[in-house]
Amino acid sequence: MGSETRPLSIFFFPFMAHGHMIPMVDMARLFASQGVRCTIVTTPGNQPLIARSIGKVQLLGFEIGVTTIPFRGTEFGLPDGCENLDSVPSPQHVFHFFEAAGSLREPFEQLLEEHKPDCVVGDMFFPWSTDSAAKFGIPRLVFHGTSYFALCAGEAVRIHKPYLSVSSDDEPFVIPGLPDEIKLTKSQLPMHLLEGKKDSVLAQLLDEVKETEVSSYGVIVNSIYELEPAYADYFRNVLKRRAWEIGPLSLCNRDVEEKAMRGMQAAIDQHECLKWLDSKEPDSVVYVCFGSTCKFPDDQLAEIASGLEASGQQFIWVIRRMSDDSKEDYLPKGFEERVKDRALLIRGWAPQVLILDHQSVGGFVSHCGWNSTLEGISAGLPMVTWPVFAEQFYNEKLLTEVLKIGVAVGARKWRQLVGDFVHKDAIQRAVREIMEGEEAEERRIIARQMGKMAKRAVEKDGSSWTNLNNLLQELKLKKV
């Protein structure tokens, strides 16, 4: 069969963390629906998660599958079976995990040599995949999994180092050159960015990420042009990157079953969850979740409980503890009994997109990870912003100052995995602010407009639909 008639073959290589895997699996499903032969490359421990997410697409006859390569985590100081960043036992093990991820290069190259795909979509944390693909004449597309805003702000901070001009960690500085005046403090920046931290594994890795991004074929962005047009243009015209925004990727999950099967097995039955939501009035429930990686200490969980109770709002709270012990006394005494008629507590994984899309949900308390942020935007929801680490403080600025659909809870310090401590009064205030009063209604109107815009973008002839088809057409012309 000639290259003109055989389907385009693309390898998708997500970093082993749920926040990276889920959107890339969505992306592979989206590409498969357009006739692309898609192969998702992962490690044996992560294969079941991906398999459950693509089962329905396979039944529909689309060409999508999973292949595995070995992960040598124990050689780098990781516990046996630790193959996902979300399962590392401590923040100190994060660096070991990134080192171990580098050992995937050799088996990945063997896979490329054997199968010769037409393109590789490689996660940002596999910067070497640009050179690996180039060995076999294969173009590599980078996937960061974040917003244009965060990409632009992060690069401006990295290049210009504006934090060197301030005398304290809490003194604000302006990020130079951006379309909007955005202020941050040193305490809100990733620690590996700051001077004196350049010898860290992560700092070196992120330098490689930027270098190989420039030499790659281009960047796929899980966003919508209409959401952040000034930053999409800045990324292309000022930073000189080739890019295609094809999001929101989560919208490829159309029905209840697809939304429920996304990610890990939920800790609650989807029908029980929907039944509870169906019993509530429209826009009356606050959804509280901090992503798959953030795990708060017990004293912070107790503070969240007190703040939510004092807010007087109905809520769904997804609880993930830092501690592995089975004690249940970390919540205030009598809390669950007092809120039982207006709260649903989920200990573990939640069917997030299913919940956010329900008409009863009227607000979202989020850690500002980009997947959650874009899922909230797609659902048309105002948000309480509670950034913890990674690029989340940038995303908070996008929500609160550019899009104006967010209310900051007051987290001020970047802290790996565990976050800055926030008191119950601040939590109560922020939750009420997105749910009550005229300003809350104004935010909700803006958020709803953005939700409609997101859905239009992925429909036929929408901006993201058009970008995807243009990219696929370009790749077909470049077939190996």
Curated annotation (Swiss-Prot):
EC number: 2.4.1.-
One MF annotation (Gene Ontology) recorded for this entry: UDP-glucosyltransferase activity
Keywords, ordered alphabetically: Glycosyltransferase, Transferase
Domain of life: Eukaryota
Residues engaged in binding UDP-alpha-D-glucose: G19, A350, Q352, H367, W370, N371, S372, E375, E391, Q392
Active-site residues per Swiss-Prot or TrEMBL entry: H20, D123
SUPFAM superfamilies hit by this protein: UDP-Glycosyltransferase/glycogen phosphorylase
Principal EC category: transferase
PROSITE patterns: UDPGT
Stated role: Glycosyltransferase probably involved in salidroside biosynthesis. May catalyze the glycosylation of tyrosol (2-(4-hydroxyphenyl)ethanol) to produce salidroside, the main bioactive component in the root of Rhodiola sachalinensis used in traditional Chinese medicine.
Misc. remarks from the entry: Transgenic cell cultures and transgenic plants over-expressing UGT73B6 exhibit a 2-fold increase in salidroside content.
Family the UniProt entry places it in: Belongs to the UDP-glycosyltransferase family.
Full protein name: Probable UDP-glucosyl transferase 73B6
